[in-house]
Amino acid sequence: MKKIVLAFSGGLDTSFCIPYLIEQGYEVHTLFVNTGGISISEEKHLSNRAIQLGAKKHKNVNVETKLWDQVLVPLIFSGALYQNRYPVLCSDRYLIVSESIKLCKKLNTKYIDPIPCNFQYKPSFFSHTC
């Protein structure tokens, strides 16, 4: 069975993805990347939700320090703008994808569905390979 890493938020889109991926023949491993602002009890709730929906395993990773050191400080110093208008401070998605790829390597799988994108779930964007 092919393994896939799904970046899991517990929201509608990622909650749909777990049973859908299982139906498509994948062994689903979920990952929640905590970039700050979520309690330990909320993390536990996300873990339980992922398992209840059918995930084989769930992992929580805290990247609060990495977000500050590797993303926010350099972006603030750069003055970078998104679409020449908005400060580029919503860049935690890069850490989410990075942690997802690490888990892919640990599981020896090449399938990933990071989801943190500016679009609603569309099957044509599904299941990227590492």
Language-model segments: residues:
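ATP-dependent adenylation/nucleotidyltransferase module used to activate substrates
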Residues: 1-130
